[in-house]
Amino acid sequence: MMSISLIWGIAVVVSCCIWFIIGIRRRKVGEPPLDNGLIPYLGCALKFGSNPLEFLRAKQRKHGHVFTCKLMGKYVHFITNSLSYHKVLCHGKYFDWKKFHYTTSAKAFGHRSIDPSDGNTTENINKTFNKTLQGDALCSLSEAMMQNLQSVMRPPGLPKSKSAVWVTEGMYAFCYRVMFEAGYLTLFGKDISKTDSQRAFIQNNLDSFKQFDQVFPALVAGVPIHLFKTAHKARERLAESLKHKNLYMRDQVSELIRLRMFLNDTLSTFDDMEKAKTHLVILWASQANTIPATFWSLFQMIRSPEAMKAASEEVNGALQSAGQELSSGGNAIYLDQEQLNNLPVLDSIIKEALRLSSASLNIRTAKEDFTLHLEDGSYNIRKDDIIALYPQLMHLDPEIYPDPLTFKYDRYLDESGKAKTTFYRNGNKLKYFYMPFGSGATICPGRLFAVQEIKQFLILMLSYFELELVESHTKCPPLDQSRAGLGILPPLNDIEFKYKLKH
């Protein structure tokens, strides 16, 4: 009579054989090279997740510029030749770029699908974003952000005795605190009936946001939030504060949120909590990448004496041209849209900081079987497969960016000091050379506001404060690879700096 262990052993072997026979995808003629990985369902996910850049470089050396990997039950076709990016986007009629994003949003934030085709709402969310994050609406949003940044950085009633004192703080913690509060107030307004407790309210939301955001990569990967009790409670607290009954009590709510409240109330079947969670999506999208992007921009600027000098001269010149004067009385600074757009040095600093820290994954799902025509050849793609671009491969390509791991503040400036828009690879001009915000239909709708608020932050830091790193020769902190694929990677550890108000 067979032992229990032998029976289990046979069962495992049989299961593995069945999986090998029917569970492994076979490469067909005309398809890209295929790597199923060794682990059922996960495929190559663990290796990819540990270091996506090195994983893709290794696969590129083995298979060429186009290859397929099984990741979490999905088959992902990676296109790694930056000269082919524009060709991918030309196949837009075969792609469903919404499916992945809508599914991920519902999974991470806990609301029903916001895809109009699923019947829960008829709101076109992209149309809403385009209407409220461009043109005159962007001007109003930027003006509010500038006011809130100054209020947070230089709170009214600050004793003069404290103005000349050096304050030492973690730079990432500082950027997190300032950008979260100013951004929250800009989008969701202020409760003027609770002025004294406003800061405590923001701090509580900041703490909850950190707890929720910490597990966000796991949620995107499909891990149920109920396994993270602290993060689950934090998400529910954040959503509770964004219920319409609470937002109606706040003043100076942005046009974006006011319009979304109206459309949620008139076009959706969401309950109060689900409506609030769709606003939580916007809170997360406005903070999760902007905060680390702000840190990297400030850190790289302070760390480079040449960048600090060039940026300070540009900001001082812009303020003088605008008739703005800094004084010990703390006069507010205001630069309009045209003036903010005419700061090529700051633009280049921000772009270079994001080039070195962005690790987004541009994803599109195939709506049907089709043939993808690229510079490297033609490939057959199956329905429901995923096409993916990983721009970090391009951002760190030495053929495009010489000495790619070195911060060069003027990398995006031409010889005349204006924005440089021409880059080459193998002698061929690139149509896409900088993609921290995505591309095509999936490009981030809030990218213009994000860049402007980082620029405003840098302007105010240079205008109001003397800035120094505690250790002048501080090394650049490593990137937190656990968030690879989600956008801008935060530092793995904080960096101490010190600041004091200028006189």
Curated annotation (Swiss-Prot):
Reactions catalysed: cholesterol + reduced [NADPH--hemoprotein reductase] + O2 = 7alpha-hydroxycholesterol + oxidized [NADPH--hemoprotein reductase] + H2O + H(+); 4beta-hydroxycholesterol + reduced [NADPH--hemoprotein reductase] + O2 = 4beta,7alpha-dihydroxycholesterol + oxidized [NADPH--hemoprotein reductase] + H2O + H(+); lathosterol + reduced [NADPH--hemoprotein reductase] + O2 = 7alpha,8alpha-epoxy-5alpha-cholestan-3beta-ol + oxidized [NADPH--hemoprotein reductase] + H2O + H(+); lathosterol + reduced [NADPH--hemoprotein reductase] + O2 = 5alpha-cholestan-7-oxo-3beta-ol + oxidized [NADPH--hemoprotein reductase] + H2O + H(+)
BP GO terms, sorted: bile acid and bile salt transport; bile acid biosynthetic process; cellular response to cholesterol; cellular response to glucose stimulus; cholesterol catabolic process; cholesterol homeostasis; negative regulation of collagen biosynthetic process; negative regulation of fatty acid biosynthetic process
Residues noted as binding heme in the record, renumbered to the chain: C444
Pathway field: Lipid metabolism; bile acid biosynthesis; Steroid metabolism; cholesterol degradation
GO molecular function: 24S-hydroxycholesterol 7-alpha-hydroxylase activity; cholesterol 7-alpha-monooxygenase activity; heme binding; iron ion binding
Presence of keyword Ribonucleoprotein: no
Enzyme Commission designation: 1.14.14.26, 1.14.14.23
Top-level taxon: Eukaryota
Location (main, coarse): endoplasmic reticulum
Its membrane topology: Single-pass membrane protein
Keyword Repeat: no
Task of the protein: A cytochrome P450 monooxygenase involved in the metabolism of endogenous cholesterol and its oxygenated derivatives (oxysterols). Mechanistically, uses molecular oxygen inserting one oxygen atom into a substrate, and reducing the second into a water molecule, with two electrons provided by NADPH via cytochrome P450 reductase (CPR; NADPH-ferrihemoprotein reductase). Functions as a critical regulatory enzyme of bile acid biosynthesis and cholesterol homeostasis.
PANTHER family per UniProt: CYTOCHROME P450 7A1, CYTOCHROME P450 FAMILY 7
Protein name: Cytochrome P450 7A1
Organism from which the protein derives: Mus musculus
Gene: Cyp7a1
